[in-house]
């Protein structure tokens, strides 16, 4: 959520910056609402003051033995007018809040301006795609050939965009998650968390999935015994970031760095026909998430660090990748700046996203009222929040199967994972 004061005082600037994201802000309507809000605020305060003044005169009139019926009627009339104005004001504030909640974050000045993914800017590459001297297979053919990926059973059990993994490929998938967690907790300073896979509406509002992206989520029915509907998490960013919702942490506790390995669930609304085969776009997938909560002045440097943490996973696994900075028109709703890390997939002969690392600045913190106490003046200030995949486990599995495949259909285990695989060097 954007800063309401900045929005009021810099409406034209806000509209101009949001336009680079493809979001058209109705400046005239917001200006009209703001004028109405001010007018109603003044009217409410004047009616309140008038009612208070007349109410005081009732006691004085009674002391003089005067009839107070007329004054009482006047107080009642002012009270009715006041209640009506308060309702009008509340309606205006509710509309302004609804508009504010629908606005994406302002892009950072360092984010390249562009309309869509074709205008993202590559910032670096690591590794060289392998040259094969045999006809390569994609991860689907490899996984099915090794009896490790069972798409047919998943369709029978649930439906499309799900997977059943078996044997050593299931073990490899588990090993990847453990390897990522160990790397981030032992070398990168993150604290591991086990979090709920179901979250409430307030949590989704806090991180920005609601109210705009409810169709992308899976929602539970019936409600819990508390009468509350819940939703499956689309990413562990939601529960991890909401750990500081409605709280004030000490400045000395910062930065807070959290990680979790969870299943994630997405309806993939609007993705009909995209990546219908394989593991690239599933309704249920595993991901190791990285979240940082930092002071505002540290957040841009933290974005670089967090992105490097995600890249380190690919480097340790020997997987070629490139990192791109997203243009304004391709960034996620709550992001002010985002790096996408794209891994090389020989089966598709292209780079595909495997991690998205974003600085949300105070956009989520304002929604969540997540603050820290500044030592200099002992006053609370909004945190900056960052998140990124470190990494998407299923897509990393895809990359290993395709990049480490052999001519006979077997797959070599990357050295970094062999201790997690009981010393196994090859599948198949």
Curated annotation (Swiss-Prot):
GO biological process terms, semicolon-separated: selenocysteine biosynthetic process; seryl-tRNA aminoacylation
PROSITE patterns on file: AA_TRNA_LIGASE_II (PS50862)
Pathway: Aminoacyl-tRNA biosynthesis; selenocysteinyl-tRNA(Sec) biosynthesis; L-seryl-tRNA(Sec) from L-serine and tRNA(Sec): step 1/1
Top-level taxon: Bacteria
Record keywords: Aminoacyl-tRNA synthetase, ATP-binding, Cytoplasm, Ligase, Nucleotide-binding, Protein biosynthesis
Gene Ontology CC terms, in alphabetical order: cytoplasm
Reactions mediated catalytically: tRNA(Ser) + L-serine + ATP = L-seryl-tRNA(Ser) + AMP + diphosphate + H(+); tRNA(Sec) + L-serine + ATP = L-seryl-tRNA(Sec) + AMP + diphosphate + H(+)
Location in or out of the cell: Cytoplasm
Keyword Cell membrane: no
Molecular function GO labels: ATP binding; serine-tRNA ligase activity
Nucleotide-binding listed as a keyword: yes
One Pfam short name: Seryl_tRNA_N
Binding site for ATP: 266-268, 353-356
EC number annotated for this UniProt entry: 6.1.1.11
Binding sites annotated in the UniProt record for L-serine: 235-237, 289, 389
Record remark: domains: Consists of two distinct domains, a catalytic core and a N-terminal extension that is involved in tRNA binding.
Function: Catalyzes the attachment of serine to tRNA(Ser). Is also able to aminoacylate tRNA(Sec) with serine, to form the misacylated tRNA L-seryl-tRNA(Sec), which will be further converted into selenocysteinyl-tRNA(Sec).
Similarity comment: family membership: Belongs to the class-II aminoacyl-tRNA synthetase family. Type-1 seryl-tRNA synthetase subfamily.
Assembly mode: Homodimer. The tRNA molecule binds across the dimer.
Descriptive protein name: Serine--tRNA ligase
Organism: Shewanella putrefaciens (strain CN-32 / ATCC BAA-453)
Gene that specifies this protein: serS
């Amino acid at each position: 959520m954007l800063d309401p004061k900045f929005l009021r005082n810099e409406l034209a600037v806000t509209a101009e910056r949001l336009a680079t994201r493809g979001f058209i802000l109705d400046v005239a309507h917001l200006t009209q609402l703001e004028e109405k809000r001010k007018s109603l605020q003044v009217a409410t305060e004047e009616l309140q003051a008038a009612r208070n003044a007349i109410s005081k005169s009732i006691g004085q009139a009674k002391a003089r033995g005067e009839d107070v019926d007329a004054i009482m009627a006047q107080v009642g009339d002012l009270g009715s007018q006041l209640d009506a104005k308060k309702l009008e004001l509340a309606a205006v504030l509710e509309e302004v809040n609804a508009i504010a909640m629908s606005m994406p974050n302002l892009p950072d000045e360092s984010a390249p301006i562009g309309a869509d993914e074709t205008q993202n800017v590559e910032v670096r590459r690591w590794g060289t795609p392998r040259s094969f001297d045999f006809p390569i297979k994609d991860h689907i053919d490899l996984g099915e050939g090794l009896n490790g990926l069972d798409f047919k059973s998943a369709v029978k059990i649930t439906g499309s965009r799900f997977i059943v993994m078996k044997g050593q490929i299931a073990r490899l998938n588990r090993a990847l998650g453990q390897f990522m967690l160990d790397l981030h907790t032992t070398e990168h300073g993150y604290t591991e968390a086990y979090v709920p896979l179901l979250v409430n509406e307030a949590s989704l509002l806090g991180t920005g999935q609601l109210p705009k992206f409810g169709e992308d989520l899976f929602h539970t029915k019936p409600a819990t015994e508390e009468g509350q509907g819940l939703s499956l998490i689309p990413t562990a960013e939601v529960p991890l970031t909401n750990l500081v919702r409605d709280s004030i942490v000490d400045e000395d506790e910062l930065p807070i760095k959290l990680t979790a390995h969870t299943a994630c669930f997405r309806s993939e609304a609007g993705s009909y026909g995209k990546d219908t085969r394989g593991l690239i776009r599933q309704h249920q997938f595993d991901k190791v998430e990285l979240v940082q909560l930092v002071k505002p002045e540290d957040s841009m440097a933290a974005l670089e660090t967090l992105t490097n943490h995600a890249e380190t996973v690919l480097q340790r696994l020997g997987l070629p990748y490139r990192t791109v900075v997203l243009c304004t028109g391709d960034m996620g709703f709550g992001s002010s700046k985002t790096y996408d890390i794209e891994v090389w997939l020989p089966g598709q002969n292209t780079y595909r996203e495997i991690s998205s690392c974003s600085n949300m600045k105070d956009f989520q913190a304002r929604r969540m009222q997540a603050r820290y106490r500044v030592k200099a003046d002992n006053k609370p200030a909004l945190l900056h929040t960052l998140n990124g995949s470190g990494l998407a486990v299923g897509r990393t599995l895809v990359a290993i199967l395709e990049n480490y495949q052999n001519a006979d259909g077997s797959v070599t285990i990357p050295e970094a994972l062999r201790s997690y695989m009981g010393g196994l060097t090859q599948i198949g």
